[in-house]
Amino acid sequence: MESLCGVLGFLLLAAGLPLQAAKRFRDVLGHEQYPDHMREHNQLRGWSSDENEWDEHLYPVWRRGDGRWKDSWEGGRVQAVLTSDSPALVGSNITFVVNLVFPRCQKEDANGNIVYEKNCRNDLGLTSDLHVYNWTAGADDGDWEDGTSRSQHLRFPDRRPFPRPHGWKKWSFVYVFHTLGQYFQKLGRCSARVSINTVNLTAGPQVMEVTVFRRYGRAYIPISKVKDVYVITDQIPVFVTMSQKNDRNLSDEIFLRDLPIVFDVLIHDPSHFLNDSAISYKWNFGDNTGLFVSNNHTLNHTYVLNGTFNLNLTVQTAVPGPCPPPSPSTPPPPSTPPSPPPSPLPTLSTPSPSLMPTGYKSMELSDISNENCRINRYGYFRATITIVEGILEVSIMQIADVPMPTPQPANSLMDFTVTCKGATPMEACTIISDPTCQIAQNRVCSPVAVDGLCLLSVRRAFNGSGTYCVNFTLGDDASLALTSTLISIPGKDPDSPLRAVNGVLISIGCLAVLVTMVTILLYKKHKAYKPIGNCPRNTVKGKGLSVLLSHAKAPFFRGDQEKDPLLQDKPRTL
């Protein structure tokens, strides 16, 4: 009976031991359970199994909701941001980057200490001390010497010592990465980067978890946790960008008929795994034009019919990969011994190489080609695109200056005659810019009503003289076509109209004076001279006429009377 009680007590004690046993990495970092066969298949080079023990004395474990998280950092909480260049093709490298975001006004200096930013210290009402954590000043040289009792804290959670590269004393953060039942430890500053090779990983989504610890005396306390999903794929990650001239919206997958579409294939390969591989592109545009095979990642194609088409692209390449296991040699089936030949054939007694078992040859070839095996990888892209009619071309046919009834030196009006091909536009926009067509000065848009010939006249005003870049854009629901031209506006003098009027008046006045003078000269030159005759009647008449003219001119030409003394005597009767 006593022996039975002793056995039961031993079993109860053994059952209680795991509750007090040391924690393992998987207990601290995550709760995903991975079978042993998955751990062996997904083995990461340089990583360790999360079945190892965790040094809880040097790295305390805080669960979610623990009140100690609030006091883990001075001035607030530290946020860890985890990113990756996922998805990754099997065999390539995938990189994870963790960046620490400190509370407001805090940053890491060149020595690895955490300091306050000068520009916002006064806003927080801080003291004159610039440091949040001054780790380098608080450590003695003896703390960094390996093998001493004072350097026992310079270890990772699995009790492995820190590496000692140049400048490692400035690294005050410990990053523990955990995925696929394995962990990786790294010492760093406010950012850490880890790359893993995916050659042995299973395709599918996986989770990466990172826990960050900071120095706290001779221990390390957690300050942040973060996790992110990454994807391992056995298909080449492919994306295709489609662009077309005059297409109004590149993201709606609606394109124009009779204009080439540029297809550009983008392969997501951040680790340059496919740089040395020949890649072929097989296109099927869905318009019964056949299959196009190209080695170039860009291709142009023009649809000549309206409608909806299914685009299919297959990308193929060969990448290095493990060789398949050798096929086991199959022993020949048992058969009855053949009847002896009538005469012995010595040549059959020695087996020729062609009669050797195939297993030997397969094993030999497998060993030789084990380093040169390649695996075909494929990538696929599919899209449904719609082809419609649109505005194909816009051109300026004529530019004319608009005559102004009243001179306006500040503005100049110009008429532009614009034509287009294709669909009928619904809107016309004009952008007036500087001569480089970079800085817009004026933009005017208005609806237009165009007939079937697509001919319209646009009048625009220009502020002052100079050279302008004029951009005309005609658009409808699916297309947007444009054309540009340079135009020079000559200068105008504000006083030029008044000066022109004055010039005309002066010219008219000068012409009138000239005509008058010429008329007088011609009159004097051609005036006929008639002497006084002996006829008494004529004499009396002439004398009376002279007397009458003399009396009439007397009030107007008094000064000239002395020049004609004969007229001063009164007429007398002889």
UniProtKB/Swiss-Prot annotation:
InterPro entries: Ig-like_fold, PKAT, PKAT_KLD, PKD/Chitinase_dom, PKD_dom, PKD_dom_sf. Could be a melanogenic enzyme. Residues 23-502 are extracellular. GO terms for biological process: bone mineralization; cell adhesion; cell-cell signaling; negative regulation of G1/S transition of mitotic cell cycle; negative regulation of T cell proliferation; negative regulation of tumor necrosis factor production; osteoblast differentiation; positive regulation of cell migration. Keywords: Cell membrane, Endosome, Glycoprotein, Membrane, Phosphoprotein, Signal, Transmembrane, Transmembrane helix. Residues 250-338 form the PKD domain. This is Transmembrane glycoprotein NMB. It comes from Mus musculus (Mouse). The chain crosses the membrane at residues 503-523. Its main location: membrane. The gene is Gpnmb. Residues 1-22 form the signal peptide. It is a single-pass type I membrane protein. It is found in: Cell membrane; Melanosome membrane; Early endosome membrane. Gene3D superfamilies: Immunoglobulins. A motif (Cell attachment site) lies at residues 558-560. Residues 320-353 are annotated as: Disordered. The keyword ATP-binding does not apply. One of its GO terms (cellular component) is plasma membrane. The modification Phosphoserine is found at residue 546. Residues 321-345 have a biased composition (Pro residues). Coiled coil: none annotated. May be up-regulated in bone metastatic breast cancer cells. The keyword Disulfide bond does not apply. Belongs to the PMEL/NMB family. One of its GO terms (molecular function) is syndecan binding.
